Amino acid sequence: MGLRFPTATQRQIVFRRLFDSGNNDDYDEAAVVAVLGWVHRFEVVVRIAGLLLFQISTAVAVLGSFSLVFPTATLKSRPGFPCHVVWAPEVLLLVPVASALFVYFRYERPVLAQRNRHPRCRRPFRQLVLLLAGLLAHIPALGVTCACQEPREVLTSFVLTLVITLLCAEVVFICRDNCTLSDQFALINGVWVVVFLANVLIVFTRPWTWPLRLLLGFYSTVGLIFAGHFSQQVLFVRHVLMPRDVAHTSLQLFITFISLFFLILRIRNCQDLLSDLRLLELPSSDAMTLTPNDLSHASSSTPLSTLSP
């Protein structure tokens, strides 16, 4: 259940019912107007707080991605890595504050002046462009995170599932006025099934070893789940930038980014797992010629029991 506020039309209906009952005292009228004003202010505050929470969670996810990709020794030796700015994390946390202020002065102030019709409703294509830009802005961080530590097959399967489900969400957003919410969710779930079957077909028809197939299938499936969940959240944000259930949506997205954080932590072991598999597949003659460094690396790597999710 989302935290929803009454629309301007609903407020007008309530306002008219109150005054059609015969009580037209100036005191009652002033009280109702004051209550509606405070409700609208509370709505604006909750919207800005939800947007700020969403942006902060994004910044935390990006910072966590950098801390997972790059070793701790590198971060300590170069305090401003990778931007060569000592206060890079603190500066990055100012981005959500600036974003929330921009949205408030650009989109919320007109609502205060024109409550009957929001200006963003008159330009749906422009708002669609803004939605796509907001989605694409988070993909480079994910791509950099995966590219710095993942094999090409894992990166490709993960990014493809993400892009396909985001495209599905964009199609649903365009057709939001022509079908019900249940039909939109059914469309997204149908795309999930198709992409999952295609992914299984690709993974199990390649000449790979079974451990590698299971590894790629596991990560691509988790990526598919994350991308599908994210596309559902995009569906919730049908009213672009300022959804009426923005508090619930921001909380869901925050949980999603936390899940992505642990997913990246899980993916980081991929190289160690593959190296362990290669060592196990070596013939006995090659195993006898292993150097002490190889043996120490094999003993310090992640055990094969971590393959199971």
Swiss-Prot record:
Keywords: Host cytoplasm, Host membrane, Membrane, Transmembrane, Transmembrane helix. It is found in: Host membrane; Host cytoplasm. GO terms for cellular component: host cell cytoplasm; host cell membrane; membrane. It is a multi-pass membrane protein. The chain crosses the membrane at residues 50-70, 85-105, 128-148, 154-174, 185-205, 210-230, 245-265. It comes from the Viruses. Belongs to the cytomegalovirus US12 family. This is Protein US16. It comes from Human cytomegalovirus (strain Merlin). The gene is US16.
